[in-house]
Amino acid sequence: MPRSRAYNVIAVLSWPILYGLYRLGARGRESVPVETGCVLACNHVSSFDPWPLGLPLWPERQLRFMAKSELYWFPLNKLIEAAGAFPVRRGQRDTVAIETAVRLAREGNAIAMFPEGTRRSKGLVKKFEARPRTGAARIALEADVPLIPAAVKGTDRLLRLERLRVAYGPAVEIDDLRGRDVAEAAVEATARLMTRIEELEASL
């Protein structure tokens, strides 16, 4: 798996901020495979969620994120690509992004995704604002890799300097869904995934 120098630089600069200023606490890192591909699916409360989600896994793991296509303007697109992200068109089924994610997962990469699709409205805590997207589960099923749930807390209160927390859980059981119609299997796998994410979030 190729390593991104830009990702390493961002991680080094972020380390004292997250662990010093925000006292980042992480548990369950052993649930995320180090060598094999996987899909890491997390709740989404802030644009800063990728920050505490990825740093506790570094340097053993560099996450590959889907970045909304609206961010792909020069020179920001160069930094995004250098950090290992790839574009996705939000609000529509992006076949190219899905195929890219499946290929990367099969190659041993950890694909980070947010099934809620967008950040939650302020004040929404437990209920998901909209029907969760099935893309994360679909990618895990098609790539035949583990589907790992995760949850972050505190990224919506950065100005208050509240402590950041992240938890990673054991892989969601989806082996019994493989071989079924992909669309139907993805819906069931997503339901299981969101239950696990809610449980992790409640434990933080």
What do these predicted ranges mean?
Residues 10, 19, 33-92:
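Catalytic core of membrane glycerolipid acyltransferases/transacylases, capturing the structured
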Residues 19-27, 95, 150:
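Short gly/ser/thr-rich secondary-structure transition/capping motifs
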